[in-house]
Regions:
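Hydrophobic alpha-helical segments within and immediately flanking transmembrane helices
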Residues: 42-50, 63-81, 92, 100, ...
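Single transmembrane alpha-helix segments in multi-pass membrane proteins
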Residues: 30-79, 104-115, 119, 257-262, ...
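Cytosolic-side transmembrane-helix boundaries in multi-pass membrane proteins
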Residues: 1-22, 138, 198-212, 279, ...
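Inter-helical junctions in multi-pass inner-membrane proteins, predominant
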Residues: 27-39, 180-184, 214-257, 277-291
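Helix-loop-helix "hairpin" substructures at the membrane interface of multi-pass membrane proteins
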Residues: 161-238, 265-267
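Transmembrane helix-bundle core of multi-pass membrane transporters
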Residues: 112-186, 213-216, 281, 285, ...
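Alpha-helical transmembrane segments within multi-pass membrane transporters and channels
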Residues: 83-127, 134, 267-272
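Membrane-interfacial amphipathic/re-entrant helices at transmembrane-helix boundaries
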Residues: 1-47, 74, 85-89, 115-120, ...
């Protein structure tokens, strides 16, 4: 796993692209740049836990966004039943989802470790469908919306008006990135996890308990994405299939950044989030935002493949 440190060549390309896009819209519509930063942070904070699982456990978790969806439903249930601010559900959500991660690992993930990748993909895809259907049966497919007055607050500076709650995503992305980086660099379990991610057989030979490491990393990642679901529910509608698009975008960001490169995820999130904001700011073009997102990903992968062939 690459943490905060030296940048790769591909990251410089992403940074350059984000800077160019940011400079253009800053000169024309600065509020679009702020929206792009907020959108980028949301993508990054969702993708980082998925990258941790893929980089160390080696599993592509196609149910990733569905765990976030469950976290959002937990926030809704907590707020409705208690009458308290749903933000207070973050710590209970992390604890609950850490336990859910343990249960999921032992019952579903561990039995397929070392199996063909297609089997793992089908299993996590099926798990996502089960979680979506469980949410549908429990809450119906109708979108649910929390009423939290302060999430719609805005700030005006001169002629620039922008929402303030979305900067929670920025703070969350920075916090999650540095927590993961410090955990991997400065803790015994984190260093063991990096060793397992780089060479599982070698790590086992030096006495590292691989299954225990997988368990901790998987459960920690599920706890993080469950807490993100709580924050997400405060601003967005909650419904059973809300997490699926974020699973795909997270996986695509990981593919662009490279497996194990959590620093690159931040930069590519910035590039894609800002690009999406530019598209949505164009009258009548909002529906093209996802198309542009995936077109940029395809273009990046094609260019990288061409560069590798040339070398």
């Amino acid at each position: 796993m690459q943490t905060a440190g030296k940048l790769r060549k591909r990251e410089y390309q992403a940074i350059l692209g984000a800077i160019i896009a940011g400079a253009i819209i800053l000169a024309v519509k600065p509020e679009v740049l702020l929206e792009g930063i907020q959108r980028s942070s949301l993508y990054a904070v969702i993708a980082l836990p998925m990258a941790l699982i893929l980089g160390i456990v080696g599993i592509i978790n196609l149910a990733h966004g569905d765990f976030m969806m469950l976290g959002s439903y937990l926030a809704y249930w907590f707020a409705v039943k208690s009458g308290l601010d749903p933000l207070l559900a973050i710590i209970p959500a992390m604890l609950a989802f850490f336990l859910i991660g343990i249960l999921t690992f032992y019952s579903i993930i561990k039995p397929v470790l070392g199996s063909p990748e297609l089997n793992q993909l089908l299993l996590t895809f099926g798990l996502g469908l089960v979680l979506e259907e469980a949410a549908n049966l429990s809450f119906t497919s109708a979108p649910l919306k929390l009423s939290v007055p302060y999430v719609s607050a805005s700030l005006t500076i001169g002629e620039l008006t922008f929402g303030t709650f979305e900067f929670v995503y920025v703070l969350a992305a920075i916090l999650v990135f540095y927590i993961i980086s410090l955990f991997l660099k400065n803790t015994r379990i984190g260093r063991a996890a990096r060793a397992v991610g780089q060479n599982p057989k070698g790590a086992k030979l030096v006495g590292i308990d691989i299954n225990k490491t997988y368990l901790i990393i998987f459960s920690l990642s599920i706890a993080i994405v469950g807490a993100i679901g709580v924050i997400f529910a405060m601003r967005h509608s909650v419904f059973p299939v809300m997490g699926a698009p974020y699973t795909m975008k997270s996986f695509c960001l990981i593919a662009m950044a490279g497996i194990g490169n959590i620093t690159g995820i931040l930069w590519y999130s910035a590039l894609l989030g800002v690009s999406e904001s530019i598209i949505t700011a164009i009258p009548g073009a909002a529906g093209w935002a996802d198309l542009v997102f995936f077109a940029l990903i395809v273009g990046t992968i094609l260019i990288r493949s061409y560069q590798q062939r040339v070398k």
